Amino acid sequence: MDYESIKKILFHFDPETAHHIAESAFELASFFPFILNRLQEKFLVKDPMLSQELFGKTFCNPLGIAAGFDKNATMTKTLHALGFGYVEIGTVTPKPQSGNPKPRLFRYIKQEAIQNAMGFNNDGAEVIKARLQRITPASFPIGVNIGKNKTTPDEQALQDYRFLIKTFHSLSDYLVINISSPNTPGLRDLQNESFIKELFSMAKELTNTPVLLKIAPDMSEDQAVSLCSTAVDAGAAGVIATNTSIDYSLLRGAKDFGGVSGKVIKEKSFAIFKAVAKELFGKTVLISVGGIDSAEEAYRRIRHGATLLQIYTSFIYGGPGLVKSINEGLIEYLKKDGFTHISEAIGIDIR
């Protein structure tokens, strides 16, 4: 059965139920190596032109699944088999939490967008750590996206991040500090220079595992550049730009809560990424996410300084076929422009 047929069935359900159905299927598939092998043969693009060594691991292609899809590390192996060069799990919090009241996930099919107000629902660090112990070390890179519990006051947030770094640094190829989700009250207030300086200075003392910062698109370009520069100066190994947006003017019929993602945030996300890349390209690893839905868009981000890319919403609408077509399309763009390896194209438009 092709993905369009599967999607028609899944889209009969509300988005969160559909996600749980997919999660159950993906989790089941992960226990059967022959299924994973078949999926890999069909969807996973492994080409020397796209392969990169980063963070001490080989990324067979630059496209990863963004955090929020595999919140609990239940689908990690299957997502790699479906074509992703790496998988970022989470967001994980120290204690389990159920997230915000339902309904909290909404599709906007004609606009190929999603709005979510999930609120870091996850099984908690202990359970997710045990799952990762069963699948690591993996043959592909795994990132862990970490966030504070909703009940943790901002002035104690540092302790949550300390605990999470100590818990996951040996089970991940990189860690991501999430202070940019709009769905935990007060979390975005931590996107300030003094907290970021303190956080990354602490991280540097705790681990050699690369720790990255993920930022929101809802700030000025100057502010984004300043925050990211502060993080890199304090020891951040990279920047992920961007998270979902709370600019509801981008989406027709938007709710007045939660974060918007998909095609509608493409230009907003790209503008912030471009500003950060102009300042930090060559100084740190830059990962672009937000509205990437084609090889053409992926290539634009790469030419503007992205070493790696992530998708989420476009995967919901396009399925694993999209992952494959983006990676194969990137190879074609590289060849057309006379490049023999992705590294030659990264940042070519801003050098």
UniProtKB/Swiss-Prot annotation:
Which residues are noted in the entry as FMN-binding? 67-71, 91, 145, 178, 214, 242, 262, 291, 312-313
Q: Which GO terms describe its biological process?
A: 'de novo' pyrimidine nucleobase biosynthetic process; 'de novo' UMP biosynthetic process
What Pfam families does the record tag this protein with?
DHO_dh
Topology relative to the membrane: Peripheral membrane protein
Localisation: Cell membrane
Cofactor needs: FMN
Q: Which residues form the active site?
A: 181
Q: Quick one: signal sequence residues?
A: none
Per UniProt, the cofactor note for this protein states: Binds 1 FMN per subunit.
Q: Which residues bind substrate?
A: 71, 116-120, 178, 183, 243-244
Q: Which reaction does it catalyse?
A: (S)-dihydroorotate + a quinone = orotate + a quinol
GO molecular function per UniProt: dihydroorotate dehydrogenase (quinone) activity
E.C. number, please?
Answer: 1.3.5.2
InterPro entries for the chain: Aldolase_TIM (IPR013785), DHO_dehydrogenase (IPR050074), Dihydroorotate_DH_1_2 (IPR012135), Dihydroorotate_DH_2 (IPR005719), Dihydroorotate_DH_cat (IPR005720), Dihydroorotate_DH_CS (IPR001295)
User: Pathway listed for it?
Assistant: Pyrimidine metabolism; UMP biosynthesis via de novo pathway; orotate from (S)-dihydroorotate (quinone route): step 1/1
What is the annotated quaternary arrangement, including any partners? Monomer.
Q: What does this protein do?
A: Catalyzes the conversion of dihydroorotate to orotate with quinone as electron acceptor.
Quote the protein name from its UniProt record.
Answer: Dihydroorotate dehydrogenase (quinone)
Q: Which organism is it from?
A: Nitratiruptor sp. (strain SB155-2)
